[in-house]
Structure formats: C-alpha cells, structure tokens
C-alpha cells in the first residue's frame, strides 16, 4: 500500500512539474519568437513602406481615406497609434474593423480589471492549506481541499460572469446606436445598396417590373435577371483561357529576350531581327496539356498560343450567342428593387409581402452589386431547404471526423500521464526538460492551429452551397460554423481528451468513477490552454505585425510568381483585407476558453489580458495602415461575437457546478444553479431586446423632425402633389392634410470634434472626453434657405431627425456614472459624435450617373466582354508583332508597361480596361483599382521606384 502511494505521489509530482514546465516552455519559446518578430518589424517598417504603410505612402486608396503617416522612429509610432480616435479607426477600418478592434480591447480590459479582485481572493484561497499540489497547479481549483472555500469561487464567479453580461448589454446598446447613426448618415443613406432590396423566391406573378411595382410605394427600379444556367461558367472559362494566353505571350516574349541577351554576350554588335520566331524555336514555345481528367500523365501536349488562338474565338462565339439570347431564358426568381429612399427600402424589407409561406423570403438589404453571388439567385424554396440541410450535415460530419486528430493533439499535451498506462512511452522522461516542454506545449498548440487552418475554405464552400446570396452572407455563415468548430474541437475535445489522458490509469482500475475522475482532472487541462493563449498573444500578434507571408511574396517570391505585368500590378496595387468569418471566431473562442477557466484557474486571466492587448495593437496597426476594407457587412459580426462569448460563461458555470458536485459542496451547488438560471434569464432578455433592433434602421433615425422635409434616408414621395388638401395613404384611405399640423422646431444638441479652443472644464464634462464634447445648439449658426442647420465642417445639410428631438440636455458625469448609464451616454445622439467627417459626404465611389445606376444590378455574365490582354513593351518591337498576331482573336496592348533586356518589368500606369476577372494564380480580382488612384498614378511616385529597387522583381 505504501509503495502504491509512493508511486502515485511520484506520478503526481512528475505530472505537476511537467505541466508547469509546459507553460514555462511555451512562454519562453513564444516570447523568443515575439522578440525576434517585433525587432524585425521595427527595423523593416522604416524602409519597406509597401508592406508596412501602403495606405499612407502610396496612392492606392481614395485620398479622403489616406491616413497621415506615423512617426518614423523605432518606438515613436506606438503612442500616436494608441491615441487614434474612434472616428479615425472607423474611417480607416470601416464598421466591421472598428468593432473587431473594440472586441479585442474590451476582452483585454475586462480580464485586466477582473484580476484586481479575483487574484487576491482566489489565488490565496487556492494556494493555502490545500491538496499539496505544486507549481502552477497550486494556484488552481484542484488544490482546494476544504468545501467551505467553494463559496469564494461561487461569488467571484457571480461577479465575473454577470459583470461581463452587463458589458455585453452596454456593447449591444452602443452597437445599435452606432450602426443606426452610420446607416442614417449621408454617406450610407445615399448609397444605392442602402435603398435596394433583394427579394428571393419571388412567385411568377411578380417576375415582371410592372407587377412588382404594385407591391410597394416608392419603387424606382426593378432588376429581374435572365440568363442561361451555363453562361456564368462559360464566361469564366473564356476569361481564364484569355488570361492563360496573356501569360503564354509574356513567357514567349521573355524567352526571346533571354536568347538575345545570351547572344549579345557572345556578339555585342549583334543586329536584332524583328522576327521573334528566330529566337524561340517551336519546341521552346509555351506548351500545356489539355486532357483535364489525367493531364499530368496522359494529357495531350499542345502549343498554348496556337491552341488558344484557335479555341478562344469558338468559346467567345458561344458566350455571345448565350448573351444575345438571354432575354428568352427563364428569369431568376430573385429580384433587386431600388426604392426612392432608404426609408422606403427598410419598410419593404421588414413587412410581410406575400400571403403564402416560403415565398418572397429571405429578404436582404445593403448588398453591393460587386458582392452578389449570382449563382445562388435562381434557387427555389425547396432547393434552398435541401441545400441548407446538406451543408449543415456536411459540417456536422466534419466536426465528428475532425475530433480524432484533435483528440490526439490533446493527448500529446498530457502525454506524461498517459505513460502511466502505456509503459513503453516512459522513454519520454529521459528527454531533456526543454525538449519535453516543447513536446507537450509548443508542438500541440502549433499542431492545433495548423489543423484548424484547413477548415475555412471548406466552410465557405458550404456557405455558397447552402445559398448565401452575397460575400457578406458567406462570411456570416462562416462565422457561425467556424465558431462551432473552434469551441468543439479546439476547446471541448482537447479538454476532454487531455483530462481523459491524465486519468486513464485510474479509469482502467475503477471505471465506475470515470466522471468523478474526469471532473477532478479537468482543471489540469488549463495549463495547455494557457500555452494556447500565450501562442496567440505572442507569436500570432507579432506575426501579424511582421506579415511574414506578404513580405516573402513581395520581395522574394514575386520574381518567380509574377510572370506577367498584370500579376505584378496586382501584387503592388492589391491590398490585403480581413476575412471576418474566420477572424472573429478564433478570438471569440479564445475569450470562451478564458472565461471557462477564469475561476478554475485564475492565472489564465493574466495571459489573456496581455494576449488580447497585443492582438489589439497588431490589428489596430494593420487595419488602419495596411489593410483595405473587406466587403462592408455594416458591423453584423459584432453582436454575434458578443452572444457567442456567452458560451464561455455557460461552460465556466457548468464546469464549476460539476466540480462542486464532485466535492459534495451542497451550498455552493445551490448557489451555482441559481447563478446559471440568472445567466439564462439575462441571455434571453438581451436576445429579445437587441436581436431585431440590431438588424434594422428605426424610423425615427430616418424621418425628419418636421414630418415633411427630405433627409438623407427619407424622401417625401407625396411632396409636390398638386392636391394637398386630400391625399391617400399606403392603404388607399383619404388623409385630410388640413388636419395635420407641422411640429414646431426646437433646439437640437450637436456634437463636434474638439477644437483647440475647448476649455479643460468642457473636456472634463464631455460625454466622451477622449475626443468630443457636447454643447447646446446655437441658433446663430449658419442656416440655409429652409432654416435647416448647416454643418460648416463638412458642408452637408443637417436636417433634424425625430431621433434628435429630445430637448433634455445630457448631463455631464464622471466615468462611473457614464459606465452605469449606457441608455444616456451610449444613446443615438451621443454616439453620432464618433462618426468621421467623411460620413457627412457622399462616397466618391458611389454611382451617380443614371446609366450606371440603371445597370448596377444587371446580371454581369450577359454583358461580360472578353478581357483585353496586357503585355509589356520590349526594346525590339516584338510586343507589336505579338499584338498583330492575335488581333483577330482578342484585344491586346503593350501600353503603360515595359520589359528590359534583363527581363525586368516596369509599370508606368494603370492596365487596360479589364472585366474584373478572377486571376486564379494570384487570387485577386483583377482590374479593381480605385478611381482616385487612376488620377494619382502610384507609379509616378518616387517612393514606388524606391520599393522597386528593393524588390526581387
């Protein structure tokens, strides 16, 4: 018996030492990576502006969005970056980026604040007079011996979990106010997408412009797409074939120049012929295999240029035939409808339109023409249901199958416990401590990150399969599915497999106590997740700053990958962007892990606070100075992320309940059940209060205070009607206009940016003292002919809205009162002050030409032209010969780009008109170059030449 106890104590000591070594090794290894990456970033940032400050250094975005450069010093940039105001971040990152950064910052601050009361209480209780654990386990729940101490964990859990539920309430209030203010601003309200609604599963009766216009007031245009089901695939095949020809022609040209260079070395006075074929024999011309099924082994090899010259006209003719006949094709059962204003569009999107179920639904608003997934606009309701079931089933099946490799990773993280049963694994103890720590900490966390990196592409494919009509909806579906993957695989499966591994010996001996043993060993898995949080906070954040992949692609591999001038153009002018469907879930799951272990192993709060703050800095820098905006989803990912974080609260509370049950602490069990019930109640109320409100724009933020004026969101469609005595409402009833009295105007509070003349007292009394202050409306301010106030800063007419109608002054208050009263200090009027000035102006990229607007939502495939190809101009005139050779097949030119004798490309201006074809090799949408950038040629900038001298291209 004594020998058994001795063995168990030895095993426990070994396991404890290993778990501590696991965290220490992770901290050291990831800290080293962090240091190397940050030092490299600080050095390279000063020189490599295309990678680290492209938005402020080159004309790649609209001038109005171009940020001021950060200071050039090694560390001098950090303080100005952290002091950037909300309106600056919104202007640079958009709503989606702003709320992503806000999420990271809030988690970091909440973890840091929570340490102030959890550490003094729980760490001292866990560490003193307990189960004689050592190392980090001494500071965790498993070291608690006396049941009476469970009450401390209960009450700390109440404060921590319910406190964050209050934070979620504040953030949801802020989100709805901010979104309403943004969408009601002139910049968004005047967008075509804001007043255009997509109706799907439209009955045949309404698949005509005339009939559909009868359903709503204020209909301006109706787009009903028609086209063959095969035309989109055929257009893509044609465009890819044209791009293949462009690559082959460039390769052919480079082969000739390479040969001439070689001949010049032998004979410097060589006279160059104008016949390119003299320098490139037939066998050296570009070739490819055409058998799609087995082209690598049995495909027939053909001359690429000759083959495409023959096949492209045939394919182009088929495309043109389908385009000319598209009017005879069956219409899509999805309809885009433009309304006179955003108000009419919102009304149409929110009312019940059709008497039968499953028709005229789903309904979407705010989809840009460039973001439409046209493939999914022709589905019937039964097809959509079938696809949804298939997509969800495929994801569930993958979750189950993915559990096996993830469980194996969890077992590795606790492999020292597994050696108790699997004797032959005991050789691991002979490894050096540092190597053992790497094996049990860094290797599993890296393996887990690599495993999860394969999933996003599959999930996005399932999003398209189930019928997502836009890029934003693809990301929204991905956010939900990928979060489920993250929680189940990264957290739950890893936790259970790690706990099961550490108790396998005891479970084999006493199977009836399996649940008790798992519950008691569950806290030990926290050490693995501390390592995972450290990995994310140190290695991932510094890697995001250094941008290793873009750095290597641009300066090293670009010479090999950018075989055409178009690819080089895309490399230089194409800015990276975030994919929110996968970005949010990774860090939401990190918050779930932190919250789940916050009471069981409080030390994780320290690592999480540091990790989230470092991630906040990294992404703040990238989103404001490096990345361009992703397809605008208007912030829809943020409320979902907040509600998903509640999963961590539930898991944390349920785990505590299980641990109390194992320890037979009946009083804490009752209190914990009460805590869970309160959490459920709050969750339900938050969902009921904000679920609908977060998806719509309220009427009072769109309609004018006087009831008749036009606003950016509202157009009075009855204005100007001759008979003003009697009008008809939407339902045809008569309205006596004499009986309607116009409301009197009264003072409206405004919010302006802080100026240098602001006194310290005004700043102290401000609602958001960091960047704004409040003052009463001054009737002496400028006014237009109608008496409406003019905002002198942005010269946009500011018509008072119904939501501005509260005359009550928002009282100055200290920070704690502002924290406790979000209904006042996060109200619509208060939040309006955070909007950038450009939100008072119309987007310069917005369509204003009536012709462009009338064709905005036309099915692109029915009018898509064959892309115009682009090759560089060479010193010997070969490019002109190549252009004439394909003149009857496809348009091609050699303007704005040259190639020298050393095969180096030089870009001089924008490429020829191009049809936004997806370049498979580069993964970027070609031809997407901003109008402002075309006017301000980035290649005429001396900074471009500096970057070229550093580039390997």
UniProtKB/Swiss-Prot annotation:
Annotated segments matching region Disordered: 910-953
Membrane topology: Multi-pass membrane protein
Transmembrane segments: 23-43, 103-123, 148-168, 392-412, 435-455, 481-501, 540-560, 575-595, 599-619, 642-662, 666-686
Positions of modified residues (Phosphoserine): 949
Location of this chain's protein in the cell: Membrane
A molecular function (GO) term: calcium-activated cation channel activity
Keyword line: Calcium, Ion channel, Ion transport, Membrane, Phosphoprotein, Transmembrane, Transmembrane helix, Transport
Ranges of compositional bias, category Basic and acidic residues: 942-953
Main location: membrane
One Pfam assignment: PHM7_ext
Any single Gene Ontology cellular-component annotation: plasma membrane
Free-text function comment from the UniProt entry: Acts as an osmosensitive calcium-permeable cation channel.
Family membership noted in the UniProt record: Belongs to the CSC1 (TC 1.A.17) family.
Name assigned to this protein: Uncharacterized protein RSN1
Gene that encodes the chain: RSN1
